[in-house]
């Protein structure tokens, strides 16, 4: 028991790193898992197939994943708080409610998504030459949606109780399988985009089964029992109270990016391929910063539940410093190796040139996001989710949307699109700093407010 709760006891920087590294390594393998599709189709099928899986499809998949990662964070925060408070009864009720929620929503979203795929792609002005492959990929993806949501829920629960290692082991194994399946189905069996979609969904199914098995075999404090998977209304309300604002935040974020993708789609196939591939490459940066965000959410949640307010506040400061150091190193490395990284995905010289220019333009501004990622994670762990959601929706999403409809028609071009990112990050970062200093708990009495 003591070993599993070092988050509330150990040296902060050391425990943050112990918790962070499995998350960031796991996120790296998740990115490899996703990127393998693009590399295989880009090099063995063609740039049209690369654009199909990297453009509108990537934005739609990201929207769905981000929404449900947001909802799973509701379960994660509540479970972390109950675990820190050693309230095992409510911990287990939340665990079983979360799994019931994942199964039901996975089935519903899969059915709806399959039905509206083509309509959404048309609404996004997906180029006609990319439509067939995009529809095939998304239809197969939606057939396996339940696996995706169950895995994310299970992994989120494990991290909430301080176990960031076993989700990593699952990802490493399924990542290797995904690459193997990609090569077999695309390179040897010539199945194209259908092959990478089948490979992805198959591995998501394996991931979901493995993380569920881990929870079934877990210790008695938070063991999943299949017969007890049901909705406990009080637990569901607590999960949704945290999860819905986070999911709405993620939804608005991705809707803004979907709108941006529509404008990018009008700039030609090469730009679409470069933009979509950029999202694969710079994910290396986001996985580092967001892993610190996940870590601080769990740290704050458990210490909040245990009533250790000063330790909770100190962990935020330590996490910010560590995040900035890592963010600067990663963005500098990506900047320096922009062209070689693009050549991993495609041999088309024009796509490489456009993509490298994108990276050189945007990467110097990425440091501004660190404050947003860490402070929003900390506030979430303390149960403050509504205002951070409004800050993100207004400061990031609405500004980007207004920018695209107000500025882009006057100064059209990819650089105008890219400029919306640093502008929105800068404004939102200032808003988060102000709110954090005003509302983040300073005393135990504020926990009860």
Where are these regions (language model features)?
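Transmembrane alpha-helix boundary and packing residues in multipass membrane permease domains
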Residues: 23, 27, 39, 77, ...
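Short runs within selected transmembrane alpha-helices of multi-pass transporters and secretion channels
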Residues: 72, 141-159, 167-178, 196-211, ...
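Small-residue hotspots at the loop-to-helix junctions and early N-terminal turns
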Residues: 45-59, 134, 138, 197, ...
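Helix-terminus/linker motif at the lipid-water interface of multi-pass membrane proteins
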Residues: 28, 32-51, 121-128, 184-191, ...
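Small-residue-rich hydrophobic transmembrane alpha-helices
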Residues: 50-111, 148-167, 275-338, 369-392
């Amino acid at each position: 028991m003591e070993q599993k709760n070092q988050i509330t006891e150990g040296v902060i920087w050391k425990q943050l790193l112990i918790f962070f590294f499995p998350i960031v390594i796991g996120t790296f393998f998740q990115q490899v898992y996703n990127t393998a599709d693009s590399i295989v189709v880009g090099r063995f099928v063609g740039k049209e197939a690369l654009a199909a899986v990297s453009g509108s499809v990537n934005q739609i998949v990201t929207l769905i994943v981000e929404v449900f990662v947001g909802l799973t964070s509701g379960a994660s925060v509540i479970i972390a708080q109950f675990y820190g408070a050693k309230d095992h009864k409510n911990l287990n009720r939340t665990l079983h409610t979360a799994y019931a929620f994942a199964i039901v929503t996975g089935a519903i979203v899969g059915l709806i998504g399959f039905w509206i795929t083509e309509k959404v792609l048309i609404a996004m002005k997906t180029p006609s030459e990319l439509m067939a492959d995009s529809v095939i990929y998304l239809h197969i993806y939606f057939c396996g949606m339940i696996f995706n949501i169950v895995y994310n829920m299970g992994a989120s629960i494990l991290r909430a109780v301080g176990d960031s290692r076993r989700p990593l082991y699952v990802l490493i194994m399924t990542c290797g399988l995904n690459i193997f399946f990609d090569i077999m189905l695309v390179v040897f069996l010539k199945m194209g985009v259908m092959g990478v979609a089948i490979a992805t969904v198959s591995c998501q199914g394996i991931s979901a089964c493995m993380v569920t098995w881990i929870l079934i075999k877990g210790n008695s404090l938070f063991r999943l029992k299949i017969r007890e998977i049901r909705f406990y209304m009080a637990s569901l309300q607590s999960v949704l109270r945290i999860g819905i604002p986070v999911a709405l935040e993620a939804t608005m974020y991705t809707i803004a990016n979907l709108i941006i993708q529509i404008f990018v789609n009008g700039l030609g196939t090469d730009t679409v391929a470069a933009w979509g591939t950029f999202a694969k490459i710079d994910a290396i940066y986001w996985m580092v910063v967001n892993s610190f965000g996940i870590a601080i959410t769990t740290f704050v949640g458990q210490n909040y539940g245990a009533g250790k307010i000063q330790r909770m506040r100190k962990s935020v400061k330590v996490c910010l410093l560590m995040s900035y150091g890592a963010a600067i190193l990663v963005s500098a490395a990506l900047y320096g190796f922009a062209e070689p990284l693009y050549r991993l995905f495609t041999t088309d010289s024009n796509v490489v040139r456009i993509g490298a220019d994108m990276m050189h333009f945007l990467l110097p501004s990425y440091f501004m996001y660190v404050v947003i990622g860490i402070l929003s994670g900390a506030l979430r762990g303390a149960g403050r989710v509504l205002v951070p959601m409004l800050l993100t929706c207004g400061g990031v999403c609405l500004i980007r949307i207004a920018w695209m409809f107000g500025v882009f028609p006057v100064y059209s071009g990819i650089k105008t699109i890219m400029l919306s990112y640093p502008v929105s990050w800068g404004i939102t970062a200032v808003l988060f700093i102000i709110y954090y200093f005003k509302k983040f708990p300073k005393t135990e009495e504020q926990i009860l407010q």
